[in-house]
């Protein structure tokens, strides 16, 4: 029914908070298999929900929600066992999947049919060579404003976050000896 009113944002966020709180209380602290969410992953997502609910788009902030987000995030940072990787670019290399920085890690199924591979990568990949033949729109590009947020000369973080034309990536298409992104979709 197109006349059905939308759910209120605050009601949806309250439901998400209840679901994630239940997950934090009932999931194991250590995942039972790769790609499975554990209590720490749920707690990290819960912190993000409280941060979102704190009023970032309304011009004012709900300090109670900000404090809750801070408390949850600090618990994850200090007690979950995750740690930052020394080299940011390594996060995107296949051999570093499910690394100590991964709070929640989706698993890639190479050359699977649509819906079973990493569909986010397939949606965003510059072309199908990067994904082994599966990609969709591939027209997403970083905006000039976004690229200008990186310091001049910072090619490591920028090139690891976005494929930039002319950049060689040794860890993409490894069987073919790497991949140079030409900007073509």
Feature names for model-found ranges:
Residues 13, 20-22, 36-183:
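An aromatic- and glycine-enriched ligand-binding surface/loop that stacks and positions planar moieties
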Residues 26-36:
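Flexible helix-coil transition and linker loops at the boundaries of alpha-helical arrays
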């Amino acid at each position: 029914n197109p006349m059905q009113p939308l759910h209120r944002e605050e009601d949806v966020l309250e439901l998400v908070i209840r679901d994630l709180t239940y997950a934090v209380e009932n999931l194991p602290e250590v995942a039972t298999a790769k790609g499975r969410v554990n209590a720490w992953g749920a707690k990290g997502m819960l912190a993000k929900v409280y941060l979102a609910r704190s009023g970032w788009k309304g011009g004012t902030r709900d300090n109670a929600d900000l404090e809750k987000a801070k408390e949850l995030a600090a618990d994850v940072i200090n007690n979950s066992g995750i740690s930052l990787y020394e080299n940011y670019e390594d996060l995107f290399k296949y051999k570093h999947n499910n690394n100590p920085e991964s709070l929640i890690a989706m698993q890639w199924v190479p050359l699977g049919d649509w819906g079973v591979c990493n569909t986010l990568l397939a949606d965003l990949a510059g072309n199908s060579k990067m994904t082994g033949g599966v990609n969709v729109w591939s027209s997403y590009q970083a905006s000039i404003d976004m690229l200008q947020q990186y310091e001049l000369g910072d090619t490591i973080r920028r090139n690891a976050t976005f494929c930039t034309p002319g950049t060689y990536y040794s860890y993409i298409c490894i069987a073919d000896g790497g991949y140079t992104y030409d900007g073509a979709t």
